[in-house]
From Swiss-Prot:
Changing G219 to I/S: Reduces both binding and uptake efficiency. InterPro entries: Pur-cyt_permease, Uracil/uridine/allantoin_perm. Belongs to the purine-cytosine permease (2.A.39) family. This is Hydantoin permease. The gene is hyuP. Nucleobase-proton symporter that mediates the sodium-dependent binding and uptake of 5-aryl-substituted hydantoin compounds. 5-indolyl methyl hydantoin and 5-benzyl hydantoin are the preferred substrates, with selectivity for a hydrophobic substituent in position 5 of hydantoin and for the L isomer over the D isomer. GO terms for cellular component: plasma membrane. Residues 479-489 have a biased composition (Polar residues). The chain crosses the membrane at residues 30-50, 58-78, 104-124, 144-164, 167-187, 207-227, 258-278, 299-321, 339-359, 362-382, 405-424, 428-445. It is found in: Membrane. Inhibited by dinitrophenol, 5-(2-naphthylmethyl)-D-hydantoin (D-NMH), 5-(2-naphthylmethyl)-L-hydantoin (L-NMH), 5-bromovinylhydantoin (BVH) and 5-indolylmethyl-L-hydantoin (L-IMH). The affinity of benzyl-hydantoin is increased over 10-fold in the presence of 15 mM of sodium.
Length: 489
């Protein structure tokens, strides 16, 4: 039996991947800044900064952190624009350049990298839990705490970005106060000044400073690429002009910078200072070394700090997106909650903590893998389509994003070429790959446009998906006829 227009239009639409309607959005600039502040206080920055002190002095590490985070925010301005305006998640947005089925390749890569981080951060939180129980009772069982902490984060993610937002609003000031106090304890315990610590480190120079910056960009690139899953909840003016939309994008990017950079600098400094003063990059061990001599209760309190920092980061940054990917890609198999559970299990089975000792090398490779993906998505939305999309076609198996049986092989080829080109500049792999993909995608899509149109008359129906006016109506005759003609080409 042939499907009706409304059934066909909704064949890829389900409650988990539908655009977030204007009236349902609850995140403003302040809330987004709080989310990013809490996400930025993550143990991975602690470790990366600590491992970097062999090549750079502490002040240089701080500059690299600030520069890397600023670059990440600049990219966020572009990658999140479509999600803020149209309320779509990353899996749906990837259909525009890569096709309805072709998007499976980049989103699977992105999901696996996010799950790597989920497992890694869960291990760090479990280490803190294990240390707390060891200090209190002498009991230690790291595998048990990995499972328990993973389950806690699964339940947290069930409640979505709204719950995570409120948790981060609470956690942010607590984490800030504890971080500042830990800095004081380290300096006081070592009897050194802030200026003296800033000049420590750098005994074995060799790493280019540009690589240091790219490492901190790499720490955020997985979130930068899939930021849609967070900012699709951001409030916007439905009637804003193109200029008004740009101002909204800038306002949210500014909020992200204010949340990300100060927190990253504080926690990065703690990691770098711990390494030069204690000689330990593992935050759980470093805290016991620094604070344990002062007070066991204080050491426990700061292990709670590590636990809270990880808990406030991991669900939003690393578990939300893979869950959306599963339920958007296989809507008949996974609900959002089952997607969260499966994603968490896969992340833990990857056992990413085995790579803790070479984290900076991994971050650089991560940036190189996702740089071309970010370049293609920015180029496609801003330069190729000029911020025009068809929500109706994003949820159809037979629309303008179908390309060759659902796959845009040209965009995938651009990704492969840009990735290969990035290896020509080992110290700037991320930048080279991003720029190469951004530039190559433009002529590539002009060639694609000779066969498949880039725009659809169904764009006029975008607001039907965003305003509370009831079910989406069938496409009008002209749009349907136009789409059929496109698919026959």
């Amino acid at each position: 039996m042939n499907s009706t227009p409304i059934e066909e239009a909704r064949s890829l639409l389900n409650p988990s991947n539908a655009p977030t309607r204007y009236a349902e959005r609850s995140v403003g600039p302040f809330s987004l800044a709080a989310i990013w502040f809490a996400m930025a206080i993550q143990v991975a920055i602690f470790i990366a900064a600590g491992q970097m002190t062999s090549s750079f002095q502490v002040w240089q590490v701080i500059v690299a952190i600030a520069a890397g985070c600023t670059i990440a925010v600049i990219l966020l301005f572009f990658t999140q624009s479509a999600a803020i305006r149209w309320g779509i998640n990353f899996t749906v947005a990837a259909r525009m350049p890569f096709g309805i089925r072709g998007s499976l390749i980049p989103i699977t890569l992105k999901a696996l990298l996010s799950l790597f981080w989920f497992g890694f951060q869960t291990w760090l939180g479990a280490l803190a839990l294990d240390e707390i129980t060891r200090l209190l009772t002498g009991f230690t069982n790291l595998p048990l705490w990995i499972v328990i902490f993973g389950a806690i984060q699964v339940v947290t993610t069930f409640y979505g970005i709204t719950f995570i937002r409120w948790m981060n609003v609470f956690a942010s000031p607590v984490l800030l106060a504890m971080g500042v106090y830990m800095v004081y304890l380290m300096l006081d315990g070592a009897d050194v000044s802030l200026g003296e610590v800033m000049s420590m480190g750098g005994e074995n120079p060799g790493m280019p400073f540009s690589t240091a910056i790219m490492i901190f960009v790499g720490g955020w690139i997985a979130v930068v690429v899939s930021i849609h899953d967070i900012v699709k909840e951001c409030k916007v003016d439905p009637n804003a002009s193109r200029e008004g939309q740009t101002k909204a994008d800038a306002r949210y990017a500014t909020a992200q910078w204010l949340g990300m950079v100060p927190a990253s600098i504080i926690f990065g400094f703690i990691g770098a200072a711990s390494m030069v003063l204690v000689g330990e990059w593992n935050p759980v061990i470093a805290i016991t070394e620094v604070v344990g001599g002062v007070s066991i209760p204080m050491a426990i309190l700061f292990q709670v700090f590590v636990l809270l920092a990880t808990w406030s980061t991991n669900p939003a940054a690393n578990l939300l997106s893979p869950a959306y990917t599963l339920c958007s890609t296989f809507p008949r198999v996974f609900t959002f909650k089952t997607g969260v559970i499966v994603s968490a299990v896969v992340g833990l089975l990857m056992m990413p903590w085995q790579f803790a000792g070479v984290l900076n090398t991994f971050l650089n490779l991560l940036a190189s893998a996702l740089g071309p993906l970010a370049g293609i998505m920015i180029s496609d939305y801003f330069l190729v389509r000029r911020r025009r999309i068809s929500l109706h076609d994003l949820y159809r198996t037979k629309g303008i994003y179908t390309y060759w049986r659902g796959v845009n092989w040209v965009a995938l080829a651009v990704y492969a070429v840009a990735l290969a080109v990035s290896f020509l500049t080992p110290d700037l792999m991320f930048v080279t790959g991003l720029i190469a993909a951004l530039l190559l995608h433009i002529p590539a899509m002009r060639w694609v446009a000779k066969t498949f149109p880039l725009f659809s008359e169904a764009e006029s129906r975008n607001e039907d998906y965003l305003r509370p006016i009831g079910p989406v109506a069938p496409a009008d005759e002209s749009a349907t006829a136009n789409t059929k003609e496109q698919n026959q080409r």
